[in-house]
């Protein structure tokens, strides 16, 4: 964010519910300042009633928006169009001029490619069945995962995600827990880092965690303990933010520079 807000300042922001914890304003306002962009990034913490009342107005006045829980799916009906990935995933987390995108999906693809590359022959277990789970499941499937198993508290959401994946030509099913012995990738898209059993982590080749406060969750601690490769929630948060800025401005600050800033400000630990 530049020091002075004026007539030409562009509005960006995050839409969600119960999101006081978010780091997104720090990330994007730091990027705007670093890149010399005349813009401000705000948080719109909305319950369902407020969301339905003001979403159209926000879409009219904001240059770009991010969307988080619980509106990644609901927001789609208010948009003029969605790109190929978000249409298939049926979830949007980035908006630019009333167009919807999914940078969670892009972040998972980017980060997994760096860690292990091709996913051929891997069995992937995704804990959760919301918007983040959808993005992760599609990204891993497109990277070549041989099967996707959805582990969720309720079968209704899990069934919907399995049907969506299978409709798109992927091999998906519901599991109560991971029961494979090798070549496993585990994703936690729930708010609970302890939902993944330790014996499942031990058998994994890669662990992916969406929770980023603290950065070293119980899941990440266990991955480190057993020498398992991992992608932590901060890496995902920052990379999806960088991908959003590329959509908005066709340029961005590097992941490394943003993470360094967040640690320097003691915003993460």
Curated annotation (Swiss-Prot):
Swiss-Prot/TrEMBL GO biological process terms: amino acid biosynthetic process; aromatic amino acid family biosynthetic process; chorismate biosynthetic process; shikimate metabolic process
Enzyme category, top tier: oxidoreductase
Entry keyword Amino-acid biosynthesis: yes
Active site feature: 72 (proton acceptor)
InterPro entries given in the database record: Aminoacid_DH-like_N_sf, NAD(P)-bd_dom_sf, Shikimate_DH-bd_N, Shikimate_DH_fam, Shikm_DH/Glu-tRNA_Rdtase
UniProt keyword list: Amino-acid biosynthesis, Aromatic amino acid biosynthesis, NADP, Oxidoreductase
Chain sites annotated for binding shikimate: 22-24, 68, 93, 104, 212
Biological pathway: Metabolic intermediate biosynthesis; chorismate biosynthesis; chorismate from D-erythrose 4-phosphate and phosphoenolpyruvate: step 4/7
Sites where the protein binds NADP(+): 128-132, 152-157, 210, 233
Catalytic activity: shikimate + NADP(+) = 3-dehydroshikimate + NADPH + H(+)
Enzyme nomenclature, EC number: 1.1.1.25
One MF term in the entry's GO annotations: shikimate 3-dehydrogenase (NADP+) activity
Gene3D superfamilies: Leucine Dehydrogenase, chain A, domain 1 (3.40.50.10860), NAD(P)-binding Rossmann-like Domain (3.40.50.720)
Family: Belongs to the shikimate dehydrogenase family.
Subunit annotation: Homodimer.
Purpose of the protein: Involved in the biosynthesis of the chorismate, which leads to the biosynthesis of aromatic amino acids. Catalyzes the reversible NADPH linked reduction of 3-dehydroshikimate (DHSA) to yield shikimate (SA).
Protein name: Shikimate dehydrogenase (NADP(+))
Native organism taxonomy: Archaea, Thermoproteota, Thermoprotei, Sulfolobales, Sulfolobaceae
